[in-house]
Amino acid sequence: KVDAVVGQTWAAVSLAINELCKRDSFPYFPVNVAPLDSFKKGTLADCTFAAGYTPWTVGYMAASAAINDLGKKKIYFLGRSDSWGWDIQAGVETAAKEYGGTIIGRDEVSQGTSDFSTVLAKVKAAKPDVFISAQFGGDAIALLKQCYDMGLNKEMTIFNSFVTNVVAKGLPAEARDGIYGMTYFYYDMTGFKDQETVKLAAEYSKRFIDKYGTPPDAYATIAYIATQQLFQAVETARSFEPKAIQKAITDNPDFMSVKGPGKWRKDHEPVYEYAGFLVRGKGPKEQTHEWDLFEVVSVQGGEKVFPTLKSLGY
């Protein structure tokens, strides 16, 4: 007997599971960065709650951090030809307009692109302050390597909108040195302003390392928070009954997580005080051990980095 479902990083599959949960009424906690349309009123099942956020938020945070934290206002944007890329682009455009940035050039490539040389030649010629890209996973590794090989790192700030330990590990340390990105979670929060969050992140990371031998990455942490939220709701409701779990979360929207405070909204998406951490890649001279990949520089969060409820039909 299945009482609840947690998981799935692929957008199409998570939406398909959500549709089944509408029909069969299961609590569902997906663990991906889901398309913006997923959160439009009427899309999610009554007891589907997503612990991640949307690519729109990723793009908004990336542009906001580039402009406000790094002082880089002339942006060249490279998107991806799918909802991931389009949502990130919409977020970048919104933040750029809000904070006085200018998108001086943009391009778009399909997922799986391996040769970025033509695009990067255009980026180099445009001379932006910052090059923000929507690529992820293997695509991001290929892109960031080629940025380094073509010398872009010396001429502008390289900013991959959403990074993980896996992407960073796939790069030579020299290519990782000085690049920026937003991440959902980084295991080493040394020097961060909120000591309670630092403590919770450190304790969680130690448990994870003790069990698996590597530090937790962003998506492992989305899954951890999703599962934790499910169990907290079950304990409050004293039931796995979907309506009882929904009521437990709706009546008690505030929670503390290993990445700081969060609060569930009407769209079943949590607003995090620290939604994304701005990280800077460490090069060979700074890196002290295998997983010493980034330094946390700043943070983006709060209601302002999320799409408005009105825009989602609420």
Predicted regions and their residues:
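Extracytoplasmic ligand/sensor domains, especially the bilobed periplasmic-binding protein
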Residues: 2-106, 157-181
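Extracellular/periplasmic periplasmic-binding protein-like sensory domains
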Residues: 147-224, 235-236, 240, 291-313
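Hydrophobic alpha-helical
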Residues: 11-22, 128-150, 226-229
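Surface-exposed patches in mature extracellular/periplasmic domains of secreted proteins
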Residues: 7, 77-80, 215-222, 243-245, ...
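Short hydrophobic/charged patches on amphipathic alpha-helices used for structural packing
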Residues: 18, 63-64, 117-121, 141
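Solvent-exposed, acidic/polar segments of extracytosolic/periplasmic ligand-binding ectodomains
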Residues: 177, 250-314
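Structural motif
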Residues: 1, 58-61, 108-122
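Sec-exported extracytoplasmic/periplasmic mature domains
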Residues: 1-2, 18-26, 67-72, 93-101, ...
